[in-house]
Amino acid sequence: MKILRKNHPLLKIVNHSFIDLPTPSNISSWWNFGSLLGVCLIIQILTGLFLAMHYTSDTTTAFSSVAHICRDVNYGWLIRYLHANGASMFFICLFIHVGRGIYYGSYILSETWNIGIILFLTTMATAFVGYVLPWGQMSFWGATVITNLLSAIPYIGNTLVEWIWGGFSVDKATLTRFFAFHFILPFIITAFALVHLLFLHETGSNNPSGLNSDSDKIPFHPYYTIKDLLGIFLLLMVLMILALFFPDVLGDPDNFTPANPLNTPAHIKPEWYFLFAYAILRSIPNKLGGVLALILSILILAAFPLLNTSKQHGLIFRPVTQTIYWTFIANLLVLTWIGGQPVEYPFTTIGQIASITYFTIIIILMPVSNTIENNIIKL
């Protein structure tokens, strides 16, 4: 078997990626979230496949088909809630994974980092089109509001929106194409994830110390396979607790009402994992400015390798930037909270301050703190 896994054309790839892969001996539990994202993706594809067998992408029957899945299909309620809460677990792991990358300076591996940003955007797109499918009130109005933002693009905006809708409003054509997108995008994510891994294994993994670990590598199996299995067990435990005890805690009550184009909900808001970006969008009074800020809130991640001027790798020995980093995390939580609040004083003002702080920390404060720390080293 030892010879087979090293010589077989297919098993050789698996062997070099997951068994004999030389791995730094000191990577912590923060490095577990890559494998957890892989598990989340598998769970989402499998549960989604079973849901797609019973779902109908028609405006007249979509809401009823989701109710039918929950009531009449064997364990349909479980599959549906595993899928809905699995998306939340996916984004929790994704945010921690990106946060770890920023903290430990993983953006130095620029190819891996840039593919990661594409993965992040693709996952957000998948979650957005998926949220429209149950065809509840928040699904319908969320789709209307977010797709309508494209009308802010000069000259081609209105045409583009009608092209995406497949008509003059969000209707049957929109739901059908969103279902098609939601079905195909996870497989595109899987392909990008493989490319992400390919680039990572070209350079080798980063480690908490930020130092070169070539002299101290251990095989991935059994050390990190066991460690990953523990992480997977904990992830599944949290997911099952969510799905079985608190299935609707992260959802929106408005989505229990079928979509009605004639009745607008009091507060239109997306799922919790988009609230930070939604708060940034709402904090700018101009429509086009808001859309640009929304896009930049994610694309600014690509600036990290360019703005990094530090002579040290990661933040583990950099107290000044550490303080700024944790301020940034706190600011993200404030943005998430503001995104779920109504558009009125004082929430709008807090949102504007938090949005300015978000970009200021990344573009100005972090590079400045890097320079300060570089000068401290010289003393």
From Swiss-Prot:
InterPro entries in UniProt: Cyt_b/b6_C (IPR005798), Cyt_b/b6_C_sf (IPR036150), Cyt_b/b6_N (IPR005797), Cytb/b6-like_sf (IPR027387), Cytochrome_b (IPR030689), Cytochrome_b_C_euk/bac (IPR048260), Cytochrome_b_N_euk/bac (IPR048259), Di-haem_cyt_TM (IPR016174)
Leader sequence residues: none
Membrane topology: Multi-pass membrane protein
Keyword line: Electron transport, Heme, Iron, Membrane, Metal-binding, Mitochondrion, Mitochondrion inner membrane, Respiratory chain, Transmembrane, Transmembrane helix, Transport, Ubiquinone
One MF term in the entry's GO annotations: metal ion binding
Transmembrane region(s): 33-53, 77-98, 113-133, 178-198, 226-246, 288-308, 320-340, 347-367
Binding site for heme b b562: 83, 182
GO CC annotation, single: respiratory chain complex III
Cystine crosslinks: none
SUPFAM superfamilies per record: a domain/subunit of cytochrome bc1 complex (Ubiquinol-cytochrome c reductase), Transmembrane di-heme cytochromes
GO biological process: mitochondrial electron transport, ubiquinol to cytochrome c
Family the UniProt entry places it in: Belongs to the cytochrome b family.
The protein's name in its UniProt record: Cytochrome b
Protein species of origin: Akodon siberiae (Cochabamba grass mouse)
Lineage of the species this protein comes from: Eukaryota, Metazoa, Chordata, Craniata, Vertebrata
